[in-house]
Structure formats: structure tokens, C-alpha cells
Amino acid sequence: NKIGYFSFTQKAAYHARDRAMSKFNLSEDDLPYFRTLHSLAFRRLGIKKEDVMQRRHYEDLGNKTGYNLDYNEYDNEHTGLFTTKSDLLRIVQMAKLRNITPERQYNLKEHTQDITIQQLKQFVSDLNQYKKDYTLIDFTDMITEFIKSDKSPKFDVVFIDEAQDLSLSQWDMARSIWDKTQDTFIAGDDDQAIFRWAGADVDSFITQTGKIMQLTQSYRIPQVVHDIASKIINKIQNRLPKEWRPKTQRGLLSYYDDFEQ
């Protein structure tokens, strides 16, 4: 329990846990802190599932406020990804993930629906009041409450994996963890950052300081995929320069001009 491994997805956390169990002859109980950041917050804050905003709550809030609050349940990976067709919900959640006000998020003009700033302010008030009335929190609130609570365990070593996919609020939580830790290892690849649409802040990963260790040999990517991927990714200006080798197989690259093929 002196080792913490926290990843963006539950799959990565469980894979790392299973490998550690096999290599060091440990049991699952020996590695209680191999989990996602949201899972850690959920556990340490003593939250129950019924304390968390669910689809039915958003539907109820929508019925009471007159807004169509379409909302998909959080995925089983416990990433905290919030998917909705409602720009009102999206603006509020993106603002919290980015540590900015809803008004500032609104002014970024990333939404597509016809929403006034007055409607947004009223919705924020209604949402906060609803959560207060029913003693509920959402997944992003968990991160904020964890940081405020100062309930992070003290570790000898912490691993933060898939770091390129963390939001600013998750980076704040990660810092609150490694501030109590002797050694911290941050793993990720900015070239694999695909969740900016969901609030991921790859710039926080790129600007991290410390000793850098590059893994230069891929055991999954064949040569032809490496070649075309390198041509595409090198067009991105804000990225960490890196050199890596593909596996020895040549591989096969197919082109399609019709999505039905």
C-alpha cells in the first residue's frame, strides 16, 4: 500500500496491477492503489454510487428547468469522460475540467447551440441548487473535493500513467498526490493525446520537468504504419520531439476511399 499507480483508464490500471501481482507474487489486496484517479477519489472520500449524479438526475433536472439534458452514463473505465449533446452541460463540465468559469468557457465559443449567457448563468444556478437539494456530486466534483480534503495517502512511489489524457483538474489532483510522495514517475505520449475534446490538457504533460526517459522501441507498430504515422505527427508544432523504431515486420497499409468498404 506504499505504491500508487494511477491511470486515465481502468484497463491500464488493472493491467499494471495484474503484471505486478505476477512478477512479485502479490495478491490484489496487496495493491489497493492501482486504479484511476476518479476511483481513488471515490474510495478515499467514502462516496457511494447513489451520491453521484446519474442519467435519471439530469433527466429530472431537465424536466424541472425545461432543458433537454441529454446525457450518456460515464463509461466503465472510470475515466470521468462526460458525453452529452447538451451544450449547457458540456460548457459547465468543460469549465470545471479546465479550471475556468462557465462564462469564460462560453466565450471560447466551442458550443454549437443557440445559448445566451443569461441562460447559462441560470442553468449553473439551477444545477448547483439541484445537487445541493439532493446531496449529489458529479464525477468532476469528486476531483475537486479530493484536493480540498487532503485525503491522499502517503506513498513511497507513485506512477501516473496515460498522463497525456489528464485534464487540468486531474493534474491538480495528481500533484496533490505526488506532493506527499518520495518518488514520482509520469508516463505518457503526447502523440497519443486524443481527448482534448473531453478536456484533456496535453500541454501540462509537455511542460513537465524532471529526468526524461524515452522508450525508443515499439513492439506493436510495423514499419509501414510507423512511416505514415511519422509523416502525419511531425506536422504538429506543439509536441515533444522523439525518435522511435518500429518492430521488424514490414506490415501492410491499405487505403480506402469509401467508408462503406
Segment roles from a protein language model:
Residues 1, 20, 61-65, 142, ...:
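Alpha-helix C-terminal capping segments
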Residues 8-11, 35, 157, 164-251, ...:
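Conserved helicase motor core of SF1/SF2 NTP-dependent helicases
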Residues 2, 71-159, 168-173, 186, ...:
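Accessory N-terminal region flanking or inserted into the helicase ATPase core
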Residues 30-31, 36, 55-64, 114-128, ...:
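SF2 helicase/translocase NTPase motor core
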